[in-house]
Design a protein with these regions (language model features):
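Non-catalytic terminal/interface segments that mediate subunit docking, oligomerization
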Residues: 64, 250-361, 366-376, 475-477
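Peripheral docking tails and interdomain loops at the edges
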Residues: 265-276, 389-391, 411, 530, ...
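Glycine-rich ThDP/TPP pyrophosphate-binding loop and its adjacent helix/strand module
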Residues: 110-266, 272-277, 285-288, 410-520
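Glycine/charged-rich beta-loop-alpha catalytic/anionic-binding loops adjacent to active sites
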Residues: 29-36, 96-113, 135-141, 316-331, ...
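A glycine-rich helix N-cap at a beta->alpha junction
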Residues: 87-97, 163-177, 372-384
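Cofactor-/ligand-binding subdomain signature composed of acidic, glycine-rich
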Residues: 1-34, 252-268
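Cofactor-binding active-site loop characterized by glycine-rich and histidine/acidic residues
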Residues: 41-164, 302, 307, 316-317
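Acidic, glycine-rich active-site loops and adjacent beta-strand->loop/helix elements
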Residues: 70-75, 144-151, 172-178, 218-219, ...
Length: 588
């Protein structure tokens, strides 16, 4: 097997075309081996195998610099840069290799930690400028998918690359897909370029000042080598537009490109997944999308908004079709999603934008400026917030509470159960005074038989679930059940702790906190996120001039990567027994 012996791209240069074709097939098999056992991005990587072999054959990494956008197509690159063991070995070997471009893993061949989209051209222009200032001559190659071109930073990067005017090569990997189908006017031009074999006179890239090459056969190794050789060492900004097939070489991924963008482990022979990995349990994605579709039938102003990730809202292709004009996806463009939601709310619609926690930071300014300053009553549905969701350094979901709670004019709600979530969602949609964000629970779908409130205040109003004394536990959102566990363990120690569901993350309920002073010595706060700048620190600040002691439970601010959840909780003293130990040390 060639790839077991390849330690660097230089080894490829000793091979003829037929051997390179074997390398490509071995690389595809290795990628399939990894994703079938470990999970990961399937379709994007399979479609970029031949292009990766050709790039490394033609160019001279690490002297020539590759910048992968979003990293969804970087697995073949890893196989060919000395990391094949992470694709051929056992699961432990695979765990040692990140699913994203990572200089921490390979400082020689991976130039940036990348996991969010539309950044490659901008990053590459920085390398371009550094090269020009230093007077060196390496090739700078940015690799970006057509889906990533819907993001505003991609436009900014292309604009700057053209302005710099020196050699940079931008490989547009056009597989006619984002995670789902593409949305945006640019895709009409990409389609026209594909249909005309690159000859369409209305060429978006040429209008921006780029030299332009088109290759229809984007999975043909020989033609890829030829087109890359034709632009090597260029002194002009150049786009190489290649038409690839997402999922190439694996029929299930070809037949259902959206479902196979990313996947849990599967049977590589037929693409089937076990019942466990298929996740037959209830999910908020499914519950939310079904609820929205029912509500849409009675309210034509209700709009489901997504930004390139309709699965985050449970809007499958069939559900998107059913929703029709009442679902809008604007591609991977969170800034546009937020600002457009604000505009829709201003115009009398009821938009609900669903966004992964990790992508909130991509649109902080629009939330603050375009939404909150204008007090437009759009709803932000924040999903997968917390430590138990995504664990790659580029996708940490721990910072949405500090970010959103720092913005004046935004109410951030944290439901603890399914029933409470939908009550909050209905109120947030109906009210017309303020933007409301809701942190969807990330600890599974928990039901309650207790009556939940249907009306909420614009001022923070905590809910005392059990009134005790000495110790008060204020447990927010997904950590409410942890609060229940801690209260139960404390009761075994003879401590009848008060248990509070705060519901509001953005501001303290001064009335409730004042009431606690009479019969409590310690307040424990629990939140599933970064405690630095978070919910608990606001409560600690409130009590800072009093005798009340506050134990803030959350996760220390850091850039964690591929962490084990239980270990992370243990390291931050967030296991139930650890919290009880810390409480007892303080009060006894």
């Amino acid at each position: 097997m060639y790839i077991e012996k390849i330690q660097s791209p230089a080894d490829l240069k000793q091979l003829d075309l037929e051997a390179l074709k074997v390398v490509a097939e071995e690389t595809r098999t290795a990628v399939l081996n990894r994703v079938s056992k470990h999970g990961g991005h399937v379709g994007p990587n399979l479609g970029f195998v031949e292009a990766t072999v050709a790039l490394h054959y033609v160019f001279n990494a690490p002297e020539d610099k590759f910048v992968f956008d979003v990293s969804h197509q970087c697995y073949p690159h890893k196989v060919l840069t000395g990391r094949a063991s992470g694709f051929l070995g056992d699961v432990d070997d695979m765990n040692a290799i990140s699913g994203y471009s990572s200089p921490a893993e390979s400082p020689v061949y991976d130039n940036f930690e990348v996991g969010h989209t539309s950044t490659s051209v901008s990053l590459a222009t920085g390398l371009q400028k550094a090269r020009d200032i230093k007077g060196t001559s390496e090739n700078i190659i940015a690799i970006i998918g057509d889906g990533s071109l819907s993001g505003g930073e991609a436009f900014e990067g292309l604009d700057e690359a053209s302005e710099l005017g020196t050699g940079i090569i931008i490989v547009v990997n056009d597989n006619e897909m984002s995670i789902a189908e593409n949305h945006g006017g640019i895709y009409k031009n990409l389609r026209a370029l594909r249909e005309s074999n690159g000859e369409c006179q209305h060429n978006w890239f040429k209008a921006w000042g780029f030299e332009y090459k088109y290759l229809e056969e984007g999975n043909d190794l020989q033609k890829l080598i030829e087109v890359f050789q034709s632009v090597k060492d260029t002194d002009k900004p150049t786009v190489v537009h290649i038409h690839t097939e997402k999922g190439h070489g694996f029929q299930p991924a070809i037949d259902n490109k959206e479902a196979w963008h990313w996947g849990a482990p599967f049977n590589v022979e037929d693409g089937s997944r076990s019942s466990n990995s298929a996740n037959s349990a209830e999910s908020y994605e499914e519950l939310y999308s079904n609820w929205m579709l029912r509500e849409m039938k009675n309210d034509p102003t209700l709009i489901a908004v997504t930004a390139g990730t309709p699965a985050a809202a449970g809007f499958s292709p069939d559900k998107r079709k059913e929703a029709g004009k009442q679902h809008i996806d604007m591609g991977i463009a969170e800034e546009q999603a937020c600002a457009m939601a604000s505009g829709m709310a201003k115009g009398g619609l009821r938009p609900v934008w669903t966004v992964y926690s990790t992508f909130i930071q991509r649109t902080y300014d629009q939330i603050a400026q375009d939404l909150c300053i204008n007090s437009n009553p759009a709803v932000i549905n924040v999903v997968w917030g917390g430590a138990g969701t995504m664990n790659d350094i580029t996708h940490i979901c721990l910072f949405d509470i500090p970010m959103l709670c720092s913005i004046p004019g935004l109410i951030y709600l944290a439901p603890t159960t399914c029933e409470e979530y939908f009550a909050m969602l209905r109120w947030a949609i109906i009210q017309d005074k303020k933007p409301i964000a809701i942190r969807v629970p990330s600890n599974g779908v928990v039901h309650t038989t207790e009556t939940v409130d249907t009306e909420y205040s614009y001022e923070s109003r905590y809910k005392v679930m059990h009134k005790g004394s000495e110790v008060a536990i204020i447990a927010a959102g997904s950590f409410y059940q942890k609060g229940e566990n801690v209260a139960r363990l404390l009761s075994e120690q003879g401590i009848d702790a008060t248990l509070i569901n705060p519901r509001y993350l953005n501001a303290v309920d001064a009335g409730t906190l004042e009431d606690l002073k009479a019969s409590h010595r310690l307040v424990v706060t629990l939140e599933d996120g970064s405690k630095d700048g978070g919910f608990g620190e606001r409560i600690a600040s409130y009590y800072s001039t009093s005798d009340m002691k506050v134990l803030v439970g959350g996760i220390k601010k850091d850039l964690y990567d591929r962490f084990d959840l239980q270990q992370l909780l243990s390291d931050n003293r967030l296991l139930d027994e650890q919290i009880v130990e810390d409480v007892l040390k303080i009060i006894r």
